[in-house]
Amino acid sequence: MPVKKGEMVRAIREKLENSVEAKASDTRFPAYLFETKGEVVDIKGDYALVMFGQVPTPNIWLRLDQIESF
C-alpha cells in the first residue's frame, strides 16, 4: 500500500542502513527515525519528506521503500 501525504510513518532500519544514501554518509542513524512517528509532508517521485515532531530535528527525505506506516 503506497504511503500518502499526511500519513504517519517510521523508517525501516534494514532498508535504510543498507542503502546507497547510508553508504555515502554517517551510518549511525538516530533512534527516533525508527521508534517515533513521522508525518509525510511531501512526496516527490520515489522520495517522501518526513517531519519527526517529537524531537527538534530538520525534516528528512527518505525513499518510499525505506518507510512504513506507523
Swiss-Prot record:
The lineage of its organism: Bacteria, Bacillati, Cyanobacteriota, Cyanophyceae, Nostocales. Its main location: membrane. It comes from Nostoc sp. (strain PCC 7120 / SAG 25.82 / UTEX 2576). It is found in: Cellular thylakoid membrane. Transmembrane segments: none annotated. It is an enzyme of class 7 (translocase). Belongs to the complex I NdhO subunit family. This is NAD(P)H-quinone oxidoreductase subunit O. It holds the Pfam family NdhO. Disulfide bonds: none annotated.
